[in-house]
Amino acid sequence: GWPSIFYVNIPVGILAIILSLYALPNDRQRTTQRFDIPGAGFLAVSLLLILLALTEGQYWGWTDWRILAFFAFGIAGLFLFVWWERRTKAPMINLSIFSNWTFSASLLSSLGAFLALSFNLFLIPFYLQNVLGFDPQQAGFVLIATPLALSLTSPISGRLSDRFGTRWLAILGLIISALGLFSMTTLTTESTAVGVFGRLLLIGAGVGFFQSPNNSAIMGNAPRSAFGIAGSLISIMRTIGQTGGIALAGAVWAARVTASAGETYDPINAAPPNALVAGLHDAMLLAAGLCLVAIVPTLLRSQRADQDIIAESSTP
């Protein structure tokens, strides 16, 4: 049952700890700088409130006073965080890191990409089970296509980015992902598992070609002393993108299903299959558009930054 999904992570986590103890270097570098407790508090509370609003908004309603309050206080907290980081002598995040356009642009592209790709993550399981009638196990076998393609293409794109740069590979990945998302608009009530699997492979390949080069661009343009913060920012962008994307996907899908069916259903997946598919088409069309928008920051990145990464990776 459901508990097994979480139990399976226990041995994986233990194995990861053991491998980390042996594989990761023992960094004995110490610093006298005090930890920025107020800054960490402002950031943690702000992100918590924003993520709560994005998660619960689709259930409570986006105009519910609690959701509006979460957004308002979360955004206010981010302003307080920036104000404090500029003021304190030992900031948790040195905001000057964002003056590097390649670094900031790559983070924006990551946010946009995961915002778009979460549409697929959220909606396709509904399509497989409620439209095609798959049971959870059958749906799981189909959904494995995306991580499978991702695991195969990520190492390849990583090596290629070290040789040819990160910019155009990241753009290629986003284009492939957008094509994969757009291909979901051709699904019908009669589509086969093989057809869905192939579309998911395309999306996974796109993510693989985008993610490794984009992360390399972020880490390659961060000071060595800020590698930890840069890695954390990658995770934050991914989390906010996925959470916001799922909320947006749910809202768009529900609205378009209701419009197509001509009446409201509760739960929404009880609507007729044709209406569910129509809603999926509209949502995936939006997701493909968002994926293309995520190209813009990467397209505007400096070519020189790519050359620096290539030079650094080729240095023995």
Name each region found by the language model.
Residues 4-16, 40, 51, 63-73, ...:
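12-transmembrane solute porter fold
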Residues 18-31, 53, 83, 89:
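C-terminal ends of transmembrane helices
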Residues 270, 299-316:
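Intrinsic disorder in cytosolic terminal tails and internal cytosolic loops
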Residues 42-47:
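Alpha-helical transmembrane segments
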Residues 56-61:
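Short, hydrophobic transmembrane alpha-helix segments
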Residues 1:
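Short glycine-rich hinge loops at helix-strand junctions in the catalytic core
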Residues 264-278:
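Short, membrane-exposed interhelical loops at transmembrane-helix boundaries
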Residues 26-41, 88-93, 307-313:
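Flexible cytoplasmic inter-helical loops of multi-pass small-molecule transporters
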